[in-house]
Amino acid sequence: MAASTMSVCSSACSDSWQVDACPESCCEPHCCALSCCAPAPCLTLVCTPVSRVSSPCCQAACEPSPCQSGCTSSCTPSCCQQSSCQPACCTSSPCQQACCVPVCCKPVCCLPTCSKDSSSCCQQSSCQPTCCASSSSQQSCCVPVCCKPVCYVPTCSEDSSSCCQQSSCHPACCTSSPCQQACCVPVRCKPVCCKPICCVPVCSGASTSCCQQSSCQPACCTTSCCRPSSSVSLLCRPVCRPACCMPVSSCCAPASSCQASCCRPASCVSLLCRPACSRPAC
């Protein structure tokens, strides 16, 4: 070879590129060795020797750094794919923990998105739409890349299995039938209306018939059995004012017609409900 030709023939790895000063047979198959043809760290851009004969012994081994598109065919095992930043990081069948090594990201398939005891709730990752398949999804095959899992904790109370509603961030987070305690949770937001729709009663415990939807829903309260303050969120205004906050009209009448029982005390008045008259006449 000419002296100006770049070559991988080098007995020392001191420089990234060496000027060819060794015999032409150095990079031929019969003398190829680590001391003669070293893919890394002497060379970081190529995996094969600069020679007319492509020597298989100069291919890179299956390591994280030299595993490029030009030398993955000789890697062992065969599932050493590109990094997890690439869509085709791992295939479904040969994907193992010691086989797919990420370069700049976490691997796409390693841990399940759901809990161990809820195999049916393994949903897709919020970052990778096709992370998990519905049929072949296993404990070592699903994980979100940059977000939290879609399903872990229920939005509703433990004793109300039928109230598991959708999350305000992920509308299709929970389905109505397989929704369990370890399968529903809002990811980045609160539920649709401040609190779960059918978990916390808007009314008092003594009046079960008035326990309607959340105070964000139109059919929240009925005038006969609604209670204020502690059961109503400050972020959601009730559609109807609690009955105990609305004194009767005679309360603001002259003192002669005012009864002591017509105006509730201050403790019954919430921040969102004010009496019809500013001060009881009686």
UniProtKB/Swiss-Prot annotation:
A Pfam family this chain is assigned to: Keratin_B2_2
Sequence repeat extents: 26-30, 31-35, 36-40, 57-61, 79-83, 89-93, 99-103, 104-108, 109-113, 121-125, 131-135, 141-145, 146-150, 163-167, 173-177, 183-187, 193-197, 198-202, 210-214, 220-224, 225-229, 244-248, 251-255, 262-266
Description of how the protein assembles with itself and partners: Interacts with hair keratins.
Keywords: Keratin, Repeat
Annotated stretches, region: 24 X 5 AA repeats of C-C-X(3): 26-266
Tissue expression remark: Restricted to a narrow region of the hair fiber cuticle, lying approximately 20 cell layers above the apex of the dermal papilla of the hair root; not detected in any other tissues.
Homology family: Belongs to the KRTAP type 10 family.
Organism: Homo sapiens
Function (record text): In the hair cortex, hair keratin intermediate filaments are embedded in an interfilamentous matrix, consisting of hair keratin-associated proteins (KRTAP), which are essential for the formation of a rigid and resistant hair shaft through their extensive disulfide bond cross-linking with abundant cysteine residues of hair keratins. The matrix proteins include the high-sulfur and high-glycine-tyrosine keratins.
Name recorded for this polypeptide: Keratin-associated protein 10-1
This protein's record includes keyword Repeat: yes
One Gene Ontology term, aspect cellular component: keratin filament
Alphabetized PANTHER family for the sequence: KERATIN ASSOCIATED PROTEIN, KERATIN-ASSOCIATED PROTEIN 10-9
